[in-house]
Amino acid sequence: TMDDAINVMQYFVPCPYGRQIEVADGITIKFTDIGHLLGSSSIEVWLREADVEKKLVFSGDIGNFNQPLIKDPSYTREADYVIMESTYGDRYHGKHQDYVTELTDVIQRTFDRGGNVVIPSFAVGRTQELLYYIRQIKAEDRIKNHGDFKVVVDSPLAVEATKIFNMNIDEI
């Protein structure tokens, strides 16, 4: 229930990236910024029993380099066991494209034909990145003959996520 979710928050403890924390006898953890979304991390877990220590790494999505709003990922160099999400593990993403030029071209061509641009997007991460690029396009006055244009985000979750990005600008 919502009450259960709110009540459990009293047990949350913020853990900074990069600091080893002993959470129990023989168990140490460290969070690493994985560069996927704001606040995302992988976790390294060291398990010690007698003279034997094993290192496990748990990770979800791993981010890309040179993203406009997210720091580059930090990688763990070694582990005894790795457990991770791998939705795109079988795909090569290729080189980073010039998204600003591509987006400018789409907006310009659509406006020239009298249309509106509708961009479906994930509420967290992608929407904020698109807003960043659109702001850059507007600041550089890249769209010709159409003046300033209105941008609407029609997703309550995306609006709330954008507020969180704005509140944590120092993490970008």
Model segments located where?
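Short, conserved secondary-structure transition motifs
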Residues: 125-126, 146-168
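Ligand-binding beta-strand-loop-alpha-helix segment within the catalytic cores
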Residues: 170-172
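His/Asp/Glu-rich metal-coordinating catalytic cores
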Residues: 1-129, 135-144
